[in-house]
Amino acid sequence: LKLYTYLAPSKVCDGVGVFALTEIPKDTLIWRIFPKEYHKYKWEEIPNEYEDYVTNMTFCDEEGFKIDCDLDRLYGAYYVNHSENPNVRIGKNDEYISTRIIYKDEEILYNYPPQDRIWQ
């Protein structure tokens, strides 16, 4: 994949965000969420007191969660912030795809599903 992004202080929250290094055309595959290897776990495999931590640090759904086998290699998807006006979507094969032209230095934003909005 072509390098399209960089990390910098977010413009929408107190933290880090992902920004366009160059103009990104509409319908461009920016990156895949999951690398070649990850472990999938069911919710019943962990104690209830760890659920909040797991939802903060992994990709999860109603069935369970996935942990990247190579967390030494974090990529942009870990730093994408929420917006009601997103400029990316998640494709059927777990990839981030631009929904419109994303301009150079514009923050990349995704509309998290309600169950993923843990800060609310």
Regions found by a protein language model. Give the residues of each.
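Conserved catalytic SET/PR domain of SAM-dependent protein methyltransferases, capturing the structural core
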Residues: L1-Q120
